[in-house]
Each structure stands twice: as structure tokens, then as C-alpha cells.
Design a protein with these regions (language model features):
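Hydrophobic positions within alpha-helical transmembrane segments of bacterial inner-membrane proteins
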Residues: 126, 130-138, 142, 146, ...
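N-terminal, non-cleaved signal-anchor transmembrane helix
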Residues: 1-131, 143, 147, 310-322
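Pore-lining and gate-forming transmembrane alpha-helices of multi-pass membrane transport proteins
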Residues: 121, 125, 261, 270, ...
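Membrane-cytosol interface at the C-terminal ends of specific transmembrane alpha-helices
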Residues: 159, 184-234, 240-249, 300-303
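C-terminal transmembrane helix and the adjacent membrane-cytosol boundary/short C-terminal tail
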Residues: 285-322
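Generic hydrophobic transmembrane alpha-helix motif, especially the helices
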Residues: 159-193
């Protein structure tokens, strides 16, 4: 009887190498195919854009950076004068260089620059909206979680409500409420808060559904009610993650409140839109720089605070459980 020779280690290695090379060639082929389809889709979208703009899309491409050249002022010092509401030597009697026009006098000759006040309003809108969104999400998330809900039929309703709240962009909701409540920060607060409840609620209940259920089972065994089980069995495990998500949402809401200001939500976004529409280059650049510095500072601070919260998770769990 003829015995079949068993494959040697070198034969097995060659087979693995050949299979790996074949897989690499297949992946490379799929990658090039994907890039080709993406390139065709890009060309098709450019053709559609040119056709939709009556053939002027490609004609206007050389003027793509005209806005940047308009934004750069002839005198760079006017940017700082506009930011601090200091008189400009180029003042010609119009609002373009009349920077002290927006001063907000607090006491005597002490004033807050107009754009700084508007930036504070924008941050306050984001902060208040985040707090309202956090409170609303906290009220709904444990009901929406599969492992903690007291009534499963109520869980379905709550999840649908949160899906509805986050289905519409903040700017759409803000435009609706601005038409109802008039222009101002109130419309922005309502719009961002509603969207924040839906977004944070989804993140929160997904965290809750992955907690360790042993503490909850122990509390249930001694006859604890649902609120007590949530307080001592659920919250200690999820609060660090909740705080991390809230701080991340605060970063998003600062940017959202700026954008919403352009549709009547007040704050610095509304002033930025007016400066661009009126052709005030120095004021526009001052607002852009202030926005960049502020959003960068908020992002860095919230990222640092998130790292501290997640790093001290054991300490927070111990403090909440007491």
C-alpha cells in the first residue's frame, strides 16, 4: 500500500505564503476598483454641478480663492482693533471701520468688546443646551435600556422619541423656532437641547446595556425598587462614561451654536454672517480668529477633563456608591 507523504513544515509555510499573496492581490484589485468608482462618481458629480449651475461651475473655479484675498485686510492692525473695539485710523464714517460702535460698557470707562460678549453668549447657549440635554437624556436612558427598563412597551416609545429628536439637524429646528419665537438665543437653546437629548440618550442607553448586572441582581434580591437599583446598581458604573460623552457633546454644541447664529440664533454666528454680507474684511477675520481660538480652547479643556474623568473611574465609582 502506498502511503501519502505528510506535508512538511516548509510546504505548509509555502502554502500560507501563496494564500497570503493571492489575498493581497485580490485586495489590491478591489482597492483600485474602489478608487476607480470613486473617481467616476467625483467626475459625475462635478458634471452635474456644472450642469445645475447653467455651465458656470467650471468658469467660477479660478475665483475659488477670491474670498480669501478679500478677507485679508490692507492693515493687519485693524483685525486687533476690531477684536478689542479700538478706534481705527481708517474710519471713514461708515460701520466698516467704526469698531468702538459695539462697545458694552460695564462700569465707568470699563467695557467688554462686542465680539467677546457675543462669544460669551454663544458659549452660554452651548452650555445651557448641554445641561438641558444631559438632564433630558438622564431621564430617558434607563427606561430605553433593555436590561434596566421597568416596562418594555415604554422602552419602545422612548427610543422612538429619541430617534425623532435627533433625526432633524439643529439648524432646521432653530429656523423653525426662530420663525415662531423671533430671532434670539432662545431658539438656538431649544434646537440644540432637543437634538442633544436624542443624541446623548442613545449613547447613554447603549452604555447602560453593557454594564455588569450583578449589583442590580443583588439589589433586586433584597427587594429594592427600580429607582434604588438605578441609583446604586447602574449609575456608579456609567457616570464616568456619561461625563465623557457630555463633555464631547459640549464641544459639538459650541460649534452648533455658532452655525445656528447665522439663521437667527443670536451670538457670534449672526454677527459673522452680517460682517460677511456687508464686506467688512477686518471684522470678519477678527471673528474667525476669535472662533478658532475659543473652539480650540474648549476642545482642549474638555479633552483634558475627559481624560481625568476616565482615568479616575475607580475613584468616581467609589464616591457615587457611597
Amino acid at each position: 500500500m502506498t502511503m501519502l507523504a505528510e506535508p512538511t513544515p516548509s510546504d505548509a509555510a509555502r502554502q500560507v505564503t501563496a494564500a497570503w499573496k493571492q489575498l493581497s492581490r485580490t485586495r489590491r484589485l478591489y482597492s483600485w476598483l474602489g478608487f476607480g468608482l470613486l473617481f467616476l462618481a467625483l467626475c459625475g458629480s462635478l458634471w452635474f454641478a456644472d450642469d445645475s449651475n447653467a455651465g458656470h461651475f467650471f468658469d467660477r473655479l479660478p475665483h475659488l480663492f477670491d474670498f480669501v484675498s478679500w478677507l485679508i485686510p490692507s492693515d493687519w492692525n485693524d483685525v486687533w482693533r476690531a477684536l478689542l473695539d479700538i478706534a481705527s485710523p481708517h474710519d471713514n464714517g461708515t460701520e466698516q471701520f467704526n469698531f468702538p460702535l459695539g462697545r458694552v460698557y460695564v462700569w465707568g470707562d470699563f467695557y467688554i468688546p462686542e465680539y467677546v460678549e457675543l462669544m460669551i453668549i454663544t458659549i452660554n447657549v452651548a452650555l445651557v443646551s448641554t445641561i438641558i440635554g444631559f438632564c433630558g437624556a438622564m431621564c430617558l436612558c434607563f427606561i430605553a435600556a433593555r436590561n434596566m427598563t421597568p416596562f418594555h412597551w415604554l422602552r419602545v416609545i422612548v427610543k422612538r422619541v429619541m430617534e425623532f429628536l435627533r433625526a432633524f439637524p439643529e439648524i432646521v429646528i432653530a429656523g423653525l423656532f426662530a420663525a415662531i419665537l423671533s430671532i434670539g438665543p432662545l431658539a438656538a437653546i431649544i434646537a440644540i437641547s432637543l437634538h442633544c437629548i436624542g443624541a446623548l440618550g442613545k449613547l447613554f442607553y447603549e452604555v447602560i446595556e453593557n454594564i455588569d448586572m450583578k449589583p442590580d441582581e443583588g439589589l433586586k434580591a433584597v427587594g429594592a425598587n427600580w429607582i434604588t437599583r438605578v441609583r446604586f446598581g447602574g449609575l456608579p458604573q456609567v457616570m464616568p462614561n456619561f461625563m465623557s460623552y457630555v463633555l464631547l457633546r459640549l464641544e459639538i454644541n459650541v460649534r452648533a451654536s455658532t452655525i445656528i447664529g447665522a439663521v437667527g440664533g443670536g451670538g457670534i454666528g449672526q454677527e459673522l454672517k452680517l460682517s460677511i454680507s456687508r464686506g467688512f474684511g477686518a471684522k470678519t477675520l477678527a471673528l474667525v480668529l476669535l472662533l478658532f481660538v475659543t473652539i480650540y480652547a474648549v476642545d482642549q479643556f474638555s479633552a483634558w477633563l475627559r481624560r481625568r474623568l476616565v482615568g479616575e473611574q475607580a475613584f468616581l465609582l467609589q464616591g457615587v456608591g457611597k
